[in-house]
Regions:
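Class I SAM-dependent methyltransferase SAM/SAH-binding core
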Residues: 63-106
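Conserved class I S-adenosyl-L-methionine
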Residues: 1-47, 49-56
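SAM-dependent methyltransferase
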Residues: 150-188
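Residues lining the SAM
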Residues: 119-121
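A short acidic, Gly/Pro-enriched loop at the edge of an enzyme's catalytic core
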Residues: 108-115
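Conserved SAM/SAH-binding loop
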Residues: 59
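A short glycine-rich, Lys/Arg-flanked "PGG" loop and its adjoining helix->strand segment in the class I
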Residues: 133-145
């Protein structure tokens, strides 16, 4: 059996996240985190002491707020510098959170969680639907029987309604150009 080189997915590029992180996780995003965490707690019917898996937790924006609400949080992300920042924030806020550096396509846990969350549209990054299904199966396997998965994503209808091919904007002292394109299954 020969070793086949697999192509690296764009979201596995740590430099991308280090450059884009200040734009993606600006002050406005951090300011909204407490309200989002409370909404997650209500949606998932969680109580103090319940366990939550924060899938693709990034720099811990939601993980820390969930922990401040009294939940036992485990955050998983592929980008180690984000996890380092998340650990520092958790320490500064006086909460204990387990952060794990792992790709969700291969993550597994012996621990079972009352709920899992994936916030800020980080689901659907994979080029292959089979990888998205793998992630959903991994999350399901990590949940206790009857556990809840709160998944934030943009619906097709919303994406189409607000679609733009690109835009320029200023944020975090940078000028940013975004470019978007539609690929398959969006017709009609």
């Amino acid at each position: 059996m020969k070793n086949e080189k697999t192509e690296t997915e764009w979201f596995e590029n740590e430099d991308f996240w280090l450059n884009y992180g200040p734009i993606m996780f600006d002050g406005q995003q951090w300011a909204q985190a407490a309200g989002i965490a409370k909404s997650v707690m209500n949606l998932a019917r969680l109580s103090e002491g319940n366990s939550v898996l924060d899938v693709c937790c990034g720099p811990g924006r939601i993980s820390v707020e969930l922990a401040l609400l009294g939940l036992n949080v485990t955050g998983v992300d592929i980008t180690q510098p984000f996890l380092d920042a998340a650990s520092e924030t958790a320490q500064d806020e006086g909460v204990q959170i387990e952060f794990i550096n792992k790709d969700m396509r291969v993550f597994s846990s012996r621990k079972k969680f009352d709920a899992a969350v994936n916030i800020y549209n980080s689901f659907g990054y994979c080029d292959r639907i089979s990888d998205d299904i793998k992630i959903l199966k991994k999350v399901n396997a990590a949940l206790k029987k009857g556990g809840t998965f709160v998944l934030e994503c943009i619906s097709r209808e919303t994406a189409v309604k607000y679609f733009t091919e690109g835009e320029w904007f200023e944020r975090a002292g940078m000028t940013v150009l975004t470019e978007f394109k539609v690929q398959g299954a969006w017709e009609g």
